[in-house]
């Protein structure tokens, strides 16, 4: 079946954060947004059909997923990642960030240390600080355009700061790493050795590029499974963020009970009916749609790679292994953060995510979302090129 990912759908006026709140966030209303991580594509037709059925029924009472819901989710992870799950491991929440914040409260005390790896998805840092925990950073090492983990620093930071919990971003947002087996095993070994619980955010797991394979952290070893919480959701894969459903897997019974208690303390009870229906439909019927989408995104990546290489070589692409988010290095332009913001927002009329918000090591970078029609991407890069060419360049020869 051919899905039309070239179709441009008007999103303004649909209450979407990406398009409708530029003014409230300090941007001009005519900027082209490629910042927040949702897609400019409709979800799979099969998901829409299931939602239409729910709406036609017309009753939106309290709801809960049954056996078919768990079967859909578990079958997806078994088929795509070789990971066998059990139903009692599953805890549903309204979002992965919600789950991470709940885990921080459940497994650490105020003032205790939580480890992350910046530059990284900025709500990690917010969740740590908002819950009055101490942020400890194991900065990723950038070498020849490739990010790696400094394991010596990783273990030292854990020991010196008596870290209790580690937030793993896998695949990594924004740098695009898909961690290799040996890297995940080293993380698991160090964390077990020092009694550090691993919270693995695997929300981008369905988006990997050829030659790279996502590995569920809990699938590697039984002892890792007993020392981790796996955070998943259909929201990135099927563009369902607004329906607010996440599937959190916790194999360890004691950890699961403590996590459930932390969730209950927030007053949260059930996920919403539309989210349940969409999630089940997506995992039951969305495989063909996703395969075509990934092919389209691969084409978008190649377009960006070629465009920058031929027309904007001073802006460097960090070659992604996964996600539909690209990490662009603007440092060769020689601009301050304020000057780059002016270039992008006022001259290029683009709304990207400034690298600085992702923490230490993000300065001089921008994150761009390529999950959009190619015409949108072509327009964005054209505007960027025009803005760059209008100013003197500070390029090292």
Each PLM stretch: what is its role?
Residues 1-17, 27-30:
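Conserved PLP-binding active-site segment in aminotransferase class I/II-type PLP enzymes
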Residues 3-4, 26-32, 37-52, 84-86, ...:
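PLP-dependent class I/II
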Residues 54, 61-94:
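Conserved N-terminal alpha-helix of the aminotransferase class I/II PLP-enzyme fold
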């Amino acid at each position: 079946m051919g899905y039309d990912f070239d179709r441009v759908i008007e999103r303004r006026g649909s209450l979407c954060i990406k398009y409708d709140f530029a003014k409230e966030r300090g941007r001009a209303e005519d900027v082209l947004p490629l910042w927040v991580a949702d897609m400019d594509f409709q979800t799979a037709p099969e998901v829409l059909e299931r939602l239409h059925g729910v709406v036609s029924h017309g009753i939106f009472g309290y709801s809960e997923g049954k056996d078919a819901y768990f079967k859909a989710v578990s079958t997806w992870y078994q088929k795509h990642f070789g990971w066998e799950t059990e139903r009692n491991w599953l805890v549903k929440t309204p979002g992965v960030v919600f789950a991470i914040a709940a885990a921080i409260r459940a497994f650490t005390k105020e003032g205790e240390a939580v480890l992350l790896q910046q530059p990284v998805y900025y709500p990690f840092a917010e969740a740590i600080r908002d819950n009055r925990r101490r942020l400890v950073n194991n900065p990723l090492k950038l070498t020849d355009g490739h990010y790696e983990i400094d394991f010596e620093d990783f273990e030292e930071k854990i020991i010196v700061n008596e870290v209790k919990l580690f937030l793993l971003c896998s695949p990594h947002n924004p740098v695009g790493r898909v961690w290799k087996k040996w890297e995940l095993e080293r993380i698991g070994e160090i964390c077990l050795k020092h009694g550090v619980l691993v919270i693995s955010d695997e929300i981008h797991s369905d988006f990997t590029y050829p030659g790279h394979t996502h590995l569920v952290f809990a699938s590697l070893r039984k002892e890792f499974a007993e020392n981790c919480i796996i955070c998943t959701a259909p929201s990135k894969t099927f563009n369902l963020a607004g329906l607010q459903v996440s599937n959190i897997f916790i194999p360890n019974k004691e950890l699961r009970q403590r996590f459930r208690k932390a969730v209950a303390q927030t007053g949260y009870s059930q996920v919403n009916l539309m989210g349940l229906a969409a999630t089940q439909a997506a995992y039951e019927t969305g495989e063909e749609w996703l395969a075509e989408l990934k092919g389209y995104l691969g084409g978008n990546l190649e377009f960006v790679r070629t465009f920058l290489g031929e027309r904007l070589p001073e802006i460097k692409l960090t070659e992604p292994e996964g996600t539909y988010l690209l990490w662009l290095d603007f440092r060769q332009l020689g601009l301050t953060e304020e000057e780059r913001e002016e270039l992008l927002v006022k001259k290029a009329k683009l709304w990207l995510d400034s690298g600085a918000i992702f923490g230490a090591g993000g300065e001089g970078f921008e994150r761009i979302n390529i999950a959009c029609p190619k015409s949108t991407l072509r327009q964005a890069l054209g505007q960027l090129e025009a803005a760059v060419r209008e100013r003197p360049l500070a390029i090292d020869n």
